[in-house]
A protein has these predicted regions:
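Short S/T/G/P-rich N-terminal loop/turn motif that feeds into the first structured element of a domain
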Residues: 1-171
Length: 171
């Protein structure tokens, strides 16, 4: 998976135009086409994030959803993440809206949640704690009425190239 972050659609357009007409862009595509086949491309826009945004978070739980009630999802996440039980949440959580390319690897999606951690051990330890909280149980009730999960995967960053942007810039 290649994830490219842009601060705006205008910046994305500028970068793509520059890349498409360059020898570096052609070289990258030549190599990429030998080792990978694109299966999906989509554009997302962050709605809100919780936790501490950090480029050190390289292990992600990526959850694709078909949301029927975005306001309930946002309010439910706000309530859960602001609860006293989750005050020591070690990672970061992002709720994003899928603007284009809503057919994901699993099925149709309107939104995604990304939950980032510095390690899989941190993810595992926090999940064990989270699943025992009242806040999580309440969130499950809201979630079951507001969306269907269409795909879920664990994503581990192999390398991050930050072209004058870091994840913290998108907070």
């Amino acid at each position: 998976r290649v994830v490219v972050l842009y601060p705006s659609m205008t910046e994305m357009d500028k970068w793509n135009s520059k890349l498409a007409g360059s020898s570096d862009g052609a070289a990258f595509m030549s190599i990429a086409n030998k080792v990978a086949k694109p299966v999906a491309q989509y554009i997302t826009v962050p709605m809100k994030n919780w936790g501490t945004v950090s480029s050190k978070d390289t292990h992600w739980d990526s959850i694709s959803m078909n949301v029927t009630n975005p306001a309930a999802v946002l309010a439910g996440l706000d309530e859960m993440m602001s609860s006293a039980e989750l005050k020591d949440f070690p990672g970061e959580l992002w709720l994003v809206q899928v603007l284009r390319g809503q057919a994901g690897a699993g099925a149709h999606m309107t939104h995604q949640m990304y939950v980032g951690y510095e390690s899989l051990s941190e993810l595992d330890a926090w999940s064990d704690k989270l699943y025992q909280t009242r806040a999580w149980k309440k969130w499950l009730s809201i979630a079951s009425e507001s969306f269907t999960i269409t795909n879920r995967e664990t994503v581990n960053w192999l390398k991050a190239y930050e072209h004058s942007y870091s994840l913290e810039d998108f907070e």
